[in-house]
């Protein structure tokens, strides 16, 4: 098999993935050496299945496609499961913090859409949430915003889990919207 056929086969394989892949950021770094500058690239990728599983990854390489591939592989290994209410929003308001990044997530009524800025929107698109209100304060650094958003998503507790912790029936637990 020639190099060209291998390349084409890999491209087809990547496009047939069952995951939704969203590129969040690409950054170029420069190392100054005696002969000039050497450039490296870092990429942040969010991967989700559209049904409640999502992960993020950071890849670094000398070329952009290789950095994206590394980030995608890492994201697929670090996926978390998030409970989604009615297949479209989150159960309750939650706060996530990481570094200087603060994120507030609120459930939204049907038809609202994803009202989120910066690096948060690709996460909600990949996870399968279609109605949510999100606000970020502090930093606009994509690394910290993604980690803060994941911290907020991990704080979400569906009524069944809350009922089990309290020793109640699930129908007796009411989560305020």
From Swiss-Prot:
> Which Gene Ontology molecular-function terms are recorded?
rRNA binding; structural constituent of ribosome
Q: Is Ribosomal protein one of the keywords?
A: yes
Ribonucleoprotein as a keyword of this entry, yes or no, is: yes
Q: Tell me a GO cellular component.
A: small ribosomal subunit
Database matches in InterPro entries: Ribosomal_Su5_D2-typ_SF (IPR020568), Ribosomal_uS5 (IPR000851), Ribosomal_uS5_bac-type (IPR005712), Ribosomal_uS5_C (IPR005324), Ribosomal_uS5_N (IPR013810), Ribsml_uS5_D2-typ_fold_subgr (IPR014721)
* Keyword annotations from UniProtKB, A to Z: Ribonucleoprotein, Ribosomal protein, RNA-binding, rRNA-binding
**Which Gene Ontology terms describe the biological processes this protein takes part in?**
translation
> What Pfam families has UniProt attached to this entry?
Ribosomal_S5, Ribosomal_S5_C
NCBIfam families assigned: rpsE_bact (TIGR01021)
What family does this chain come from, according to its entry?
Belongs to the universal ribosomal protein uS5 family.
Outline what the protein does: With S4 and S12 plays an important role in translational accuracy.
> What is this protein's record name?
Small ribosomal subunit protein uS5
State the species of origin: Magnetococcus marinus (strain ATCC BAA-1437 / JCM 17883 / MC-1)
